[in-house]
Amino acid sequence: MLLCLAALQAPAQQLPGSIQPQIFQYPVTAPDVDPGIDHGNSDANLPEEFKKQMVFYRSLEPPGTIIIDTQERHLYLIQDSTHALRYGIGVGRDGFTWQGLLRVTKKAEWPDWRPPPEMIDRQPYLPRFMAGGPGNPLGARAMYLGNTVYRIHGTNAPETIGQAVSSGCFRLVNDDVMDLYARVPVGTKVIVRQD
């Protein structure tokens, strides 16, 4: 159907539940991310756990890999074997969660939105097309995953970060998705986990 999921590697080594991620004071801002432009939202009103930050994170994946933990509502961009840049995300609601291994196949700035037919069937009030811009639910940037309808994208509803509300996509506040977009090329490995 959607994916052959057998290609997933063993999960990263887990730390005991009582150990909290250690926050490091490394620079976490990507260069040249539209300085001086208001993108409609930032992480200013997010709970601390969903704000972008460098954390201690053990992984055998190479730097540049994206690991999405749908249970924690975090996206990790691997920096080295013990550090990752962590972003808060919104994830798929019940019935719209998935796991697997894909790659970023396309990137778009201020993407247009065309809800797929299945979404229109469920929500007939949706527009058939919406041009990119601040009112668009895909937000400031989108990274398309494989040949699926799923994306990592921004949002015009920052209050949904940390929530299970989407149709399977992963959303970040616009400032964060622009930062991530500047850091990852087409071809980036994306691992989606539900454990």
Locate each region found by the language model.
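N-terminal pre-domains immediately preceding structured catalytic cores
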Residues: 1-195
